[in-house]
Amino acid sequence: MYTSEGKKIISTEKAPKAIGPYSQAIRTENLVFTAGQVGLNPATMDLVEGGVEPQTRQVLTNLKHVLESADSGLNFVVKTTVFLKDMGDFPNMNSVYAEFFPENQPARSTVQVAALPKGALVEIDCVALLNPRRGD
């Protein structure tokens, strides 16, 4: 159900619940705007171990679930923003990112930040189109 402002709050148990006063995503008439995801396991709410590669994989899996719950998907992503704690992790993050976006890659910005929630090494948010074949 859409609010009077024309937006729909998106929430799924397949991705980590919000750790602050924000929504996992907001859906408008044609777009989905996700909150930043870090590499939290949604079942435990713990950060996955092993460095930036497994965290990036978990982040993108979380985003996939959020987008799918909004009648979208990774193939409809038009823009991502990647936040890295250390730009030295860029090649490892990038190799995992390429697995999730093998073709028709979205526009992307990548920035280094001083710190991320829960001590994460990577956070990603995105903007996506709705699936034109959705069933609303």
Identify the function of each model-found stretch.
Residues 2-136:
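Short, polar/acidic, helix-capping and beta-turn segments at strand->helix junctions
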